[in-house]
A protein has these predicted regions:
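Glycine-rich phosphate-binding loops of nucleotide-dependent enzymes
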Residues: 1-238
Length: 238
């Protein structure tokens, strides 16, 4: 579904992404982990089009999107939910989701967009809050709204950037179940996360980054015992 080949991005003297190669298969939940500053968010920004790479190629559904703007990637089926939720606070949950359903699709009939919102609001459990102003939501409800708004763009691949940050353990478990339902609805998921219990519970496959490079990938239990991964998180033993 998604193929990344030799992707590099430099900020001054810092190589934030260093010849990254990565594949995401349709139907999987892929986690990208690594210590702070490993290049995870840079990678997500390159995939979603918020940054342009200095080198390398990105293909999505068999087509090159390396130079495509973010909105073109959204129209093609790349959705993204952000760690910092920024809804329209004076608008209701329903209205926020309708914005997502209509984004970049001016010719979409309103009734079609409303059907999309209805499906997503049921999937994400936000129906009881449909007419609530977004500014009145709890943190967990805000996170659900962010996921739901991304889903309203009808993505084939959903990028999640630490969407569980700040949640209590019980809330994180609810969010894990929601992401599973999203995958079961036919959406492939690539997510960045620091909470290892969440990664272990969700990921079919884990990619580990450090200093802009992929240093390991595979099932969680395999990468968790990889010496390079332990060194990245804990430092080299003296």
């Amino acid at each position: 579904m998604l193929s990344i080949q030799g992707l590099s991005k430099r900020f001054g003297g810092v190589l934030a992404a260093n010849s990254v190669n990565l594949r995401v298969e349709a139907g999987e939940i892929l986690a990208v982990i690594g210590p702070n500053g490993a290049g995870k968010s840079t990678l997500l920004n390159l995939i979603s089009g918020l940054l342009r790479p200095d080198e390398g190629r990105i293909e999505f559904l068999g087509e090159a999107i390396t130079q495509a703007p973010p909105e073109a990637r959204t129209w093609k089926g790349l959705g993204r939910a952000f760690q910092i939720v920024q809804p329209f606070p004076e608008m209701t949950v329903w209205e926020n989701l309708l914005v997502g359903a209509l984004y970049g699709k001016p010719n979409t009939p309103l009734k079609v967009a409303e059907r999309v919102v209805e499906e997503v609001i049921q999937l994400t459990g936000l129906a009881p809050k449909a007419q609530t102003s977004a500014g009145e939501l709890t943190l967990l409800e805000d996170k659900r709204l962010e996921l739901a708004r991304a889903l309203c763009t009808r993505p084939k691949l959903l990028l999640l950037d630490e969407v569980m940050a700040g949640l209590r353990p019980s809330e994180a478990l609810e969010a894990v179940e929601l992401v599973r339902r999203i995958r079961d609805s036919g959406v492939t998921v690539l997510f960045i996360e620091h909470l290892m219990p969440v990664v272990r519970a969700l990921a079919d496959r884990v990619v580990v980054m450090d200093y802009g490079q992929v240093i390991a990938e595979g099932p969680y239990d395999l990468v968790a015992t990889n010496p390079k991964v332990r060194e990245a998180y804990l430092g080299r033993a003296s």
